[in-house]
């Protein structure tokens, strides 16, 4: 599909800003000790490699991607409810709807919503 490359790139970056309890996030982790670049370094590396400016408003992009992920998890929750979920992780994913939506709303408010 065609879309804004920054939407895809920011989807990668949400791992840096959400806690480990939510979708295996890195928020709060000692990135340096883990050998993982900071979010700022990652943005700089992407921008340099792609020959573009980095994202202008990450908070909006984080809100978009987290709401999107919450909606996907809501669909999984429906399949769990209906007994049609195939994944062994479906219940875990379904339980993340509200925390993901809350995180998304937090970023939306930071971005000016």
PLM region spans:
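Activation segment
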Residues: 1-3
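Active-site activation/catalytic loop segments of kinase-like enzymes and analogous catalytic loops
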Residues: 6-50, 65-83
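Short, hydrophobic secondary-structure boundary micro-motifs
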Residues: 22-25, 55-56, 89
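All-alpha amphipathic helical-bundle segments outside canonical DNA-binding/catalytic cores
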Residues: 53-65
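Regulatory N- and C-terminal appendages and interdomain linkers associated
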Residues: 71-113
